Regions:
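Short amphipathic alpha-helix that is part of the acyltransferase structural core
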Residues: 1-27, 125
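Hydrophobic adenine-recognition pocket in adenosine-nucleotide-binding enzymes
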Residues: 6, 71-73
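Active-site rim helix/loop that mediates acceptor-substrate recognition in acyltransferases
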Residues: 22-43
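Conserved beta-hairpin
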Residues: 34, 41-56
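A conserved beta-turn-beta hairpin within the catalytic core of GNAT-like acetyltransferases
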Residues: 60-68, 124
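Conserved acetyl-CoA pyrophosphate-binding loop and the N-cap/start of the following alpha-helix
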Residues: 77, 81-86
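Conserved active-site alpha-helix within GNAT-family acetyltransferase domains
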Residues: 84, 106-132
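Conserved GNAT acetyl-CoA-binding A-motif
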Residues: 93-105
């Protein structure tokens, strides 16, 4: 397994990755998704023999805040440490950044995963998060 910077947006591999985890709403506007990737702070991929099997995408200013926008690992590759490696790659790259944030599903599985890599729920820190969709 190789973790490295993601190169140019490849429609087929991104589509396959998003479909593999059921994130099909992102695929309804491919040109927007492609622009989002191009304008991201960083995108890092996980590769199994050159096959993209996981990806993490971060946005922000890279100085005071980094927001983990997407983290996806194909279902057959989950529970093998790939998500942790992707997160750690971003955390290492932006280790001096004051604040790193993400939004995720409110399940025990996801909360346990993010806590295991050093994240805290905002309410655990006396904060509240707001979102407008």
């Amino acid at each position: 397994m190789e973790i490295r910077e993601y190169g140019n947006f490849q429609l087929e591999e991104i589509t396959n990755l998003y479909q593999s985890v059921g994130w099909t709403n992102y695929l309804e506007r491919i040109s927007v998704l492609e622009d989002a990737y191009a304008n991201s702070l960083c995108v890092i991929g996980a590769y199994d023999n050159e096959k993209l099997v996981g990806i993490i995408r971060a946005v922000g200013d890279g100085l005071t805040i980094v927001f983990i926008q997407d983290i996806i690992v194909q279902s057959e590759y989950q529970r093998k440490g790939i998500g942790t490696k992707l997160l750690k790659a971003v955390m290492d790259k932006y280790s001096d950044v004051y604040q790193m944030e993400l939004l995720t599903d409110n399940t025990e599985k996801t909360k346990a995963f993010y806590r295991s890599v050093g994240f805290s729920a905002s309410d655990d820190m006396g904060c509240v998060a707001f979102i407008r969709m």
